[in-house]
Amino acid sequence: MASTFRSLRNYNYRLWAGGAIVSNIGTWMQRTAQDWLVLTELTHHSATAVGIVMSLQFGPQMLLLPLTGHVADHFDRRKVLLATQAAMGLLALCLGLLTVTGHVQLWHVYGFALLLGCVTAFDAPARQTFVSDLVGESDLPNAVALNSTSFNAARMVGPAITGLLIASVGTGWVFLINALSFVPVLGALRMLRQDELHRRPTASQARGGLLDGFRYVWKRPDLKAALVMLFLIGAFGLNFPIFISTMSVGAFHAGAGQYGVLSSTMAIGSVTGTLMAARRARPRLAILLGAASVFGIGCALGAVMPNAVMFGVMLVAIGASAQTFTTSTNSLVQISTEPAMRGRVIAILLAIFLGTTPLGAPVVGWVADRFCPRWALGVGAASGFAAALVGLLYLVRHRNLRIHLRSGRPRYSIDAPQPVLHGTPPLQ
C-alpha cells in the first residue's frame, strides 16, 4: 500500500493533489450536467448534438498543437496553470449564470465548449508535465498514476452528486459549483515551495519546435505503436458521454439520477485501473495490448446487456481497462522521453488522446441516432480490438513475441528492448 501512494510523501505533490481532486470533482460535475442539458433540455435526445459539443471541446487540442507543447516546454508551467485554471473557472461561472437565469441556448453551450477547448489545449500538456516538476524521475510513473486515480475518483463522486443536484436545483447550479471548485487548485499553485520543484532544461536548452517532437516520435517504433493504439481507442472508444447518456435514455429510459449512478459506476472501475497502474514501477507495452483487448470485450458485452444493472457491471470492466490503458500509455511515454522533449511529446499524446475525439464523436453519435446506442458501443469494441492488433504487430515485428505452453498454460516471451535516442529508456 505504501508503494501505491509513495508520491504523497512529497509536500508539493501532496498540496497539488489535494487541490486538484476538488477541481476534478467540479469538472466531472460540469461534464455530466452539460451532456444532460444538451440531451434533455436543449434538444430532443440528440446524440449528434452531444457529439458536436465534444468535438468543439476537444478539437482545439489538434488545431493548437504547434503552440501548446511549445508553451509547456518553454514557459513556467506553474504560471501557465494559474492562468488556464482561472480561465476555466470563469467560463464555468458564465455558463452557470446563463443557465440559472434561463437564457442558455444550444449555441451558447457550443461556444463555451469551444472556448473551454482552447483553454484546455494549453492547460492539459502543462498540467501533465507539471507532475515531473513536482516529483523526481523515480516517482514519476507513480505520480502520473495517482493523478489519474484522483481524476477518476472525482468521476465516481462528481456524476453521482450531479444527478441529485440536477433533480433538486437544476443544471445551472452545477456549473456555478464547478466555478468555485477551481479556488483550491489555484490556492495550491500559489502555496507550492518553488525551491523544491525539480527543474527541467530551460527554453534555451530545449531543442527545436514541434516538428522535432514529431521527428523524435517517428524514430521510435515503440512510441509510434503506443500512440497509434491511443488514436484508435481515443477517437472511437472513449466517447463515454455519448455511450452512457444514450444508453441511459434510449435503451433503459432512465432519469437524471440513474444516469449519474451509471457514470459513477464506470468510475469505480476507472479508479481500480489507475490504482493497479500506480503499483507498477514501470508499465510495459504488453499491458497496453491486454487492456485494449479487455476494453473491446467489455464494450461488446455492454452493448448486449438487457438492463441498466447489468450494463453498470460491464461499465466497471470498461472503466478499469480504459484507465489501465490510458494511464499506462501516459506513464510509458513520459518516462521514456527525454526531459527536454517531454512537453512536445506529451502535447502530441494529448492531442491524440483528446483531439481525436472530434473525429470519432460525431460518427459515434450518428451511429447511436441512426441505428441505436448499442451499435455505438459496438464501434467502441471495434476500436479496442484494432488497438490490440497494433500492439500485437509491434511486439511480433520489433520484439520477437513468442507464445508457448508452460505447465499446460500459455505464456509469452519477448526480446529485451534495444537502446534508443540519447540513452532514453524505450518502452518495455
Please identify what each model-predicted range represents:
Residues M1-L427:
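Alpha-helical transmembrane-bundle signature of multi-pass membrane transport and export proteins
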